[in-house]
Design a protein with these regions (language model features):
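Extended substrate-binding grooves/exosites of carbohydrate-active enzymes
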Residues: 1-113
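Edge beta-strands of extracellular beta-sandwich domains
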Residues: 112-122
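Low-complexity, acidic Ser/Thr/Pro/Gly-rich terminal tails and inter-domain linkers that flank the onset
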Residues: 122-138
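Short acidic, flexible loop segments centered on an aromatic residue
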Residues: 163-170
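Conserved small/polar residues in nucleotide/adenosyl-binding loops
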Residues: 172-174
Length: 174
């Protein structure tokens, strides 16, 4: 598209920087049998939505999961073949937003809890985190690493609505 900052299509499961979008985890949960997938969406920072219904979706390779919002269970959901939307994701359509944390506990086919993920409401932006996909580089002038920049609150929670542009200056001349 010609819309800044997009320089390509807004479609696909991975963006131009190789960062997975939410839909990526749907495919991973179905196709990747070796790595565990437990992905919650949306984020849980919604100022002004307090008390409003905010559906929660989970992509997982486990058959069942339970949603907790600030410790209150919203029940277990299991994948089923009644429709395409129920086959590949778990949904809590009646979840009500309140700041705090959402936790998902995933269960295997025997009903045993096998995975857990927590997403917390972010506070005010505090600092940036730089995360590299590699720990070492070959000093040959050709090797590279991808650095992901995250704006986080004082507790390290991602601030999803912070849209400030961050500029970097490299002092290394090759």
């Amino acid at each position: 598209t010609n819309a800044w900052p997009n320089h390509s299509s807004m479609f696909g499961i991975i963006d131009l920087a190789s960062i997975p979008k939410d839909r990526y985890y749907l495919y991973r949960s179905v196709w990747n049998k070796k790595a565990e997938t437990l992905h919650i969406l949306p984020h849980w920072t919604w100022p002004g939505r307090e008390g409003k219904v905010t559906p929660v979706f989970v992509y997982t390779n486990h058959p069942t999961a339970e949603l907790f919002i600030n410790g209150k269970s919203y029940g277990k959901q299991s994948k089923n073949n009644s429709s395409l939307k129920n086959r590949y994701r778990l949904m809590w359509i009646d979840a009500v937003y309140e700041p705090g944390e959402i936790k998902v506990v995933a269960y295997n086919k025997d009903g045993k809890a096998v995975a857990e993920k927590i997403v917390r409401t972010a506070g005010k932006p505090h600092h940036i985190e730089l995360v590299s996909n590699r720990n070492e580089l070959t000093a040959d002038g050709k090797d590279l690493a991808y650095i992901t920049v995250k704006v986080v609150d004082k507790d390290g929670n991602l601030c999803p609505a912070d849209s400030r542009q961050i500029n970097f200056l490299s002092l290394i001349h090759i």
